[in-house]
């Protein structure tokens, strides 16, 4: 009976991973709107790496998924006056990679795809397999938007929700 009691333990509830995705447009012109305070350290880092002068938040997406499962979110980016394009952000799985502090979240099969402002040509794409420290912001990638003057930058942060 004691052996059965030790073995017959209900499984621990699955953890959830919450991911916040920020889609930024970088350009050579100074920004006209202030970005959220939590993104300021990321912008400072980006200005140290690239020559862009202004950054604009195009959209923020929030996903919550059971650990080890896939998720996707779609939306519309407004690049400017009458310049909208749809996007999709998805990943195959997100799971806790380590229990240390800070914890690391592994994101496998990350894919981002967005239309261009003009609608001409192929879509903008990013694919990655990344590890993100819980609560920290990670720049996943940058891709040019119809030339070198503007870029689309994907920044994300993730945390475990227990």
Regions found by a protein language model. Name each.
Residues 1-162:
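Outer membrane pore-forming secretion/assembly proteins and partners of Gram-negative envelopes
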């Amino acid at each position: 009976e004691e052996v059965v009691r030790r073995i017959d333990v209900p499984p621990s509830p699955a953890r959830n991973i919450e991911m916040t995705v920020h889609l930024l447009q970088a350009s050579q012109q100074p920004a006209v709107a202030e970005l959220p305070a939590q993104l300021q350290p990321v912008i400072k880092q980006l200005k140290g790496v690239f020559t862009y002068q202004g950054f604009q938040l195009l959209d923020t997406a929030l996903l919550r998924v059971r650990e080890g499962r896939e998720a996707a979110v779609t939306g519309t980016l407004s690049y400017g006056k009458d310049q909208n394009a749809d996007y999709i952000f998805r990943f195959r799985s997100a799971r806790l990679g380590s229990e240390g502090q800070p914890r690391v979240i592994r994101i496998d099969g990350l894919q981002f795809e967005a239309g261009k402002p003009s609608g001409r040509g192929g879509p903008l794409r990013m694919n990655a397999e990344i590890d993100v420290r819980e609560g920290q912001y990670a720049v996943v990638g940058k891709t040019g938007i119809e030339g070198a003057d503007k870029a689309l930058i994907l920044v994300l942060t993730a945390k475990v929700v227990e």
